[in-house]
Amino acid sequence: NWCRFAIWLTRVVAGIRYEVRGLENIPEKPCVILSKHQSTWETFFLTGYFEPLAQVLKRELLFVPFFGWALALLKPIAIDRSQPKLALKQLAKQGDECLKKGAWVLIFPEGTRIPVGQMGKFSRGGTALAVNANLPVLPIAHNAGHCWPKNGWAKYPGTIQVVIGPAMHAEGEGPRAIAELNQRAEAWVSETMAEISPIQQRVSHPEPSVVS
């Protein structure tokens, strides 16, 4: 597909290669993928690597000339972030439908591309979707931002490290289980980023408040 072509093109034109670790952690049955978000590269890579896949993205991206039109062809789960409650309902409904059809659901829980060296707070939408579907989440860390920065057109040659973590299951149900699973996934991504990204800063967050 065109996503694989884009990755091939970046290798040929910009000298951007990649290495993947943790392939043995990929479950046989599709589940919810929670990926670090630094650049556009991982959007192409993960969409081409996990098939079939539905990516959760902000609706306004679909209106970007050419890029947005191409995204629309992938039939993403487009949410309206200006209406948080509606966005959660859209994610829950459409995400569950995709999972039942045997498709992976890709979520960037930080919500936007985060500069190299920083970690954004993980939203719980992805873990809520997984818990309600009785499926695990698959955390993924990478350092694509070193070769493909968030801002600007410049691309830098190098080898991107992609690390697929162990599938994580919730311990129980409800808000408390969702929060605990989300915290585990966020901690794993943060720890792994500290290993593969030399200037990565570990960011600690206060314990999430949970209504039991």
Across the structure, where does each feature detected by a protein language model lie?
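Catalytic core of membrane glycerolipid acyltransferases/transacylases, capturing the structured
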Residues: R4-F5, R11-V13, E28-P84
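A generic structural signal for well-ordered alpha-helical segments
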Residues: T10-R11, L71, C98, A130
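Generic preference for hydrophobic
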Residues: V20, I33, Q55-V56, V162-I164
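Thr-Gly-centered strand-to-loop micro-motif
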Residues: R21, L57-K58, I79-R81, P109, ...
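Glycine-rich helix-loop-beta junction characteristic of Rossmann-like nucleotide cofactor-binding loops
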Residues: G22-I26
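A short, glycine/Asx- and small/polar-enriched loop/turn
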Residues: P27-K29, Y156-P157
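Non-catalytic C-terminal accessory region of glycerolipid acyltransferases
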Residues: L88-S212
